[in-house]
């Protein structure tokens, strides 16, 4: 089974992610790509994606990336064993996201034994713009 399929199974019970419509596209070693198709439930009063929507997309993508090394073991054991969780995040909003599909790509900047720093870049492929950059410190629990 591919890592993305394992990740989808492991994170299937993440109810808020399910409500928002975030999809796992690909998973590599400590990397992940997730997408979100914007619709009216994601919009703020100005018609752009609410900042919390972008944050949720980035936070989830970081969780998938940080736990990617456990996905095969999780699948074999049959129960989730997610050991990396968000400790701190910093989001930089760069441009409004108004339409289409948002793509989040998360990669590690520094990987330690107990903490790790990940960067997630959210892009709007429709207009080719980066809409947010998020740095997330993960902690091993």
State each model region's role:
Residues 1-141:
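Terminal targeting signals and extreme-terminal segments of soluble enzymes
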């Amino acid at each position: 089974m591919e890592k993305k399929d394992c990740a989808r199974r492991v994170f299937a019970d993440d109810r808020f992610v399910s409500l928002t419509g975030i999809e796992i596209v690909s998973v590599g070693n400590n990397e992940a790509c997730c997408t979100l198709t914007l619709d009216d439930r994601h919009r703020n009063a100005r018609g752009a994606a609410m900042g919390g929507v972008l944050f949720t997309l980035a936070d989830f993508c970081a969780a998938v990336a940080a736990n990617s090394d456990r996905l095969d073991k999780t699948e074999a054991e049959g129960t989730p064993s997610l050991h990396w969780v968000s400790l701190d995040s910093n989001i930089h909003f760069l441009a409004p996201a108004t339409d289409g599909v948002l793509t989040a790509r998360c990669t590690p900047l520094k990987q330690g034994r107990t903490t790790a720093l990940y960067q997630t870049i959210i892009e709007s492929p429709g207009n080719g713009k980066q809409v947010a950059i998020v740095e997330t410190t993960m902690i091993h629990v």
